[in-house]
């Protein structure tokens, strides 16, 4: 009897462990779905809002990059939203491969992405220009190979200097200056003045 009771307790314990493991996996999947963009797999805006202060605290200096994909509306209108989605995914996958491991890529909204990087503005600008000029991201639309182009604005950040929303706004403004200057690239603070 005693052995049967022990075996039953062990079975109950094993079953409880399996249930807890499943529950932990379910919670982890939910957490991932809350932090990741479903289409691109990039971190999403909620994750940026949650992680950006910690990233900037852990990296005394670095860069915030605001990226806007060029021609996404045109691709959606002329070739369909499925191709527009593929355009976004292609960009995101290539950017993830081109970035440092410690850099974080976020899909901020629509065709807008943010990068938090421990690199100085000049370093990340070099990397972005290399992607645009020397090793562009190719995209196939119905057998036509096109380069994915984007405009960006970069601001430097230092620990405890400036609100995150202000940095995003400044990087966004620099990105629009970049677009209005026929895609001339704009870098660190003061470069646009």
Regions found by a protein language model. Give the residues of each.
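A short pre-motif secondary-structure segment
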Residues: 104-107, 146
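Signal-transducing coiled-coil linker helices
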Residues: 2-38, 46-57, 61-63, 107
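Conserved nucleotide-binding and Mg2+-coordinating catalytic segments in signaling enzymes
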Residues: 28-50, 67-81, 89
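Alpha-helical scaffold within the catalytic cores of cyclic-nucleotide enzymes
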Residues: 92-93, 124-141, 172
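Short helix/loop segment flanking the catalytic signature motif in cyclic-nucleotide metabolism enzymes
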Residues: 87, 114-131
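Catalytic-core segments of nucleotide cyclases and related cyclic-nucleotide turnover enzymes
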Residues: 77, 129, 142, 155-193
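Active-site-proximal alpha-helical element of nucleotidyl cyclase-like catalytic domains
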Residues: 83-102
């Amino acid at each position: 009897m005693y052995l049967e009771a022990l075996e039953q307790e062990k079975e109950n314990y094993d079953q409880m462990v399996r249930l807890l493991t499943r529950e932990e996996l379910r919670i982890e999947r939910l957490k991932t779905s809350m932090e990741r963009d479903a289409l691109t797999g990039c971190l999403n805006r909620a994750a940026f809002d949650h992680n950006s202060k910690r990233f900037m605290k852990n990296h005394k200096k670095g860069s915030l990059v605001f990226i806007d994909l060029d021609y996404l509306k045109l691709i959606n209108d002329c070739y369909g939203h499925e191709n527009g989605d593929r355009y976004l995914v292609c960009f995101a996958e290539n950017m993830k491969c081109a970035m440092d491991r410690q850099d974080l890529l976020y899909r901020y909204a629509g065709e807008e992405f943010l990068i938090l990087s421990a690199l100085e503005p000049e370093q990340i600008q070099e990397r972005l220009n290399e992607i645009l000029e020397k090793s562009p991201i190719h995209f196939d639309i119905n057998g036509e190979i096109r380069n994915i182009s984007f405009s960006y604005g970069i601001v430097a950040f230092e620990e405890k200097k400036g609100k995150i929303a202000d940095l995003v706004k400044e990087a966004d403004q620099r990105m629009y200056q970049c677009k209005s200057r026929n895609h001339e690239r704009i870098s660190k603070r003061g470069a646009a003045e």
